[in-house]
């Protein structure tokens, strides 16, 4: 199956790369309309996935990741329209000059070619990934999780119907419908078809892709995000930030998983936070010895807890004596995604931003803002936690490479 699908997307990438900006934008606008028109059809297929998940004892949080409704489909359509309105990076000139030999040298943005995307649960990723790849002149091979197979299949069917109506090759998107681990591994090693592979999901998925892939990988999204409440923090502000970062949507990668608190304010802050956050949703605190003494409920934290992306109503808590200890702790356990400090001390804020090794480092704000739309990129294909090629929310430019174009008049060397 991978051979067949790989050949299709590889061949299609040449055609998609030739499309004009206008043609791509019109297509994305029409696809947005088509999603709205097919809302009932999409929800019907999504309900099959939800029914299967219910049989397997799906959690409240996983149900949220999987569920599609009219509002979420409308949001997907809005995302398509926003991508259509973004500037097209393809053929953008990055630099141009004439060198000492009289050669005219231009550097332009070009598509990566064929993109592989392996993801879990969220069917909206199907639309996000396609729209960004299509806008940047790439074809895409998708492999979603078995829990969202019906949702992913109907979304790809709708995309293909629109491609054929627009007389564009429907190989611009393909879905690996065989969700077995064996086929996934074949995809990870399909380097003769795929130019890059982007995993988006749990730490287990991302680590498996890193271990097995021969296709170049852009690592995304494990979000063990931490908030440090400094001794000078406004405790009302800190409480609101932690509650938002932990409870608004705990199943996403920019939710807070860990809390670090300066020991000088722990006795006052932690009981206040515990009281307020449990009004929103009951939280399981996994805390160190000092924190457990002032929390009314909690269990002792292990070292693993400080490095875990829970994706649940669980929060690890660490108390520290100073900023250096906080930075050391975060850099030890962080997934390099998003970290935040709540402080009124300008020096501490600057030191934290300078020394924390992460894609996004906040002062006095929730980690929930790490997002392509918020950062002005439009939709995102993922949030890269590595340092090569792309880091942070990955928008259109992250799905491009560059090419040098050199014009001469007979020069030799």
From Swiss-Prot:
One GO term of the biological process aspect: L-proline biosynthetic process
Keyword Lipid metabolism: no
Pathway given in the UniProt record: Amino-acid biosynthesis; L-proline biosynthesis; L-glutamate 5-semialdehyde from L-glutamate: step 2/2
A single cellular component GO annotation: cytoplasm
Gene3D superfamilies the record matches: Aldehyde Dehydrogenase, Chain A, domain 1, Aldehyde Dehydrogenase, Chain A, domain 2
The protein's role, per its UniProt record: Catalyzes the NADPH-dependent reduction of L-glutamate 5-phosphate into L-glutamate 5-semialdehyde and phosphate. The product spontaneously undergoes cyclization to form 1-pyrroline-5-carboxylate.
Protein name from the UniProt record: Gamma-glutamyl phosphate reductase
């Amino acid at each position: 199956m991978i051979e067949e699908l790989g050949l299709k997307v590889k061949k299609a990438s040449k055609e998609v790369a030739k499309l004009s900006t206008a043609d791509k934008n019109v297509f994305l606008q029409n696809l947005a309309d088509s999603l709205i028109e097919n809302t009932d059809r999409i929800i019907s297929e999504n309900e099959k996935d939800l029914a299967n998940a219910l049989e397997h004892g799906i959690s409240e949080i996983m149900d949220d990741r999987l569920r599609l409704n009219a509002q979420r489909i409308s949001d997907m359509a809005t995302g398509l329209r926003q991508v259509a309105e973004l500037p097209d990076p393809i053929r953008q000139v990055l630099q141009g000059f004439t060198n000492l030999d009289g050669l005219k040298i231009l550097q332009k943005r070009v598509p990566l070619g064929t993109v592989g995307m392996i993801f879990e649960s969220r069917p909206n990723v199907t639309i996000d990934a396609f729209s960004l790849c299509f806008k940047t002149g790439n074809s895409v091979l998708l492999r979603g999780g078995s829990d969202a197979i019906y949702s992913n299949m109907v979304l790809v069917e709708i995309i293909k119907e629109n491609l054929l109506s627009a007389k564009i090759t429907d190989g611009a998107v393909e879905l690996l419908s065989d969700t077995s681990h064996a086929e996934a591994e074949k995809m990870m090693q399909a380097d003769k078809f795929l130019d890059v592979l982007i995993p988006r999901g749990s730490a287990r998925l991302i680590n498996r892709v890193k271990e097995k892939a021969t296709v170049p990988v852009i690592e995304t999204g494990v979000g063990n995000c931490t908030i440090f409440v400094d001794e000078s923090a406004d405790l009302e502000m800190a409480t609101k930030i932690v509650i938002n970062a932990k409870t608004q949507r705990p199943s996403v990668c920019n939710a807070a998983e860990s809390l670090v608190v300066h020991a000088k304010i722990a006795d006052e802050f932690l009981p206040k936070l515990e009281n307020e956050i449990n009004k929103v949703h009951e939280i399981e605190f996994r805390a160190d010895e000092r924190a457990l003494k002032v929390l009314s409920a909690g269990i002792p934290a292990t070292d693993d807890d400080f490095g875990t992306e829970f994706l649940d109503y669980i929060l690890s808590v660490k108390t520290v004596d100073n900023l250096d200890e906080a930075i050391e702790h975060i850099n030890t356990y962080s997934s390099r995604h998003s970290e935040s400090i709540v402080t009124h001390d300008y020096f501490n804020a600057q030191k934290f931003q300078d020394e924390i090794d992460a894609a996004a480092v906040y002062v006095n704000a929730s980690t929930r803002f790490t997002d392509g739309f918020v950062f002005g990129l439009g939709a995102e294909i993922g949030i890269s936690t590595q340092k090569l090629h792309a880091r942070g929310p990955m928008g259109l430019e992250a799905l491009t490479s560059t090419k040098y174009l050199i014009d001469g008049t007979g020069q030799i060397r």
